[in-house]
Amino acid sequence: YAREHKRGGAWMDDCVGSLRYADGHLQKPVAYLTCNFNRPVGNKPALFTHDEVTTLFHEFGHGIHHMLTKIDTAGVSGINGVPWDAVELPSQFLENWCWQPEALSFISGHYETGEPLPQAMLDKLLAAKNYQAALFILRQLEFGLFDFRLHYEYQPSAGAKIMQTLAEVKKLVSVMPSPSWGRFPHAFSHIFAGGYAAGYYSYLWAEVLSADA
């Protein structure tokens, strides 16, 4: 659950990978999820929003990817050694279930009575799926192009032109200007402090692959 001083967001990571030892015994893979869901209040259980459920399914998709591996060499088993085109495929695929009426009806209900989610509420939720979807796609394209250009055009002698590059990308794909004082790249941890350098495009590409899976 979310708590003070805890890093925000949600992610999956591997504890150990699948490994077949010389004597034949198998070290089974272990994965863990870190999330920031709403805590229980008083004597009531934690009640997840649809967005939190989608986040859980996304990260659990990464976990399943790691734990169901059939490769017994630790360096390339599970989430390791996966091409960038596919690294987000399992997680995005599981997200799709959060938008299936049958799946939502199965996993949801009133926490006290067990009554299913009212059909009218379910219909409204599903109808909102693609609300402002174009803006979301443009945002992901902006992040992906910015990431690509930073790593492809970088010249050690000249240094990185971070804000200039972002401004040029935004002129191509953004429909809303950013304030001049904005410093979004400073918090773009995926490509600066995470493992997605030159690979952020995989999120949007995984949506295409998962839709066809």
Spans of model-derived segments:
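Cation-handling catalytic/transport regions enriched in His/Asp/Glu
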Residues: 1-213
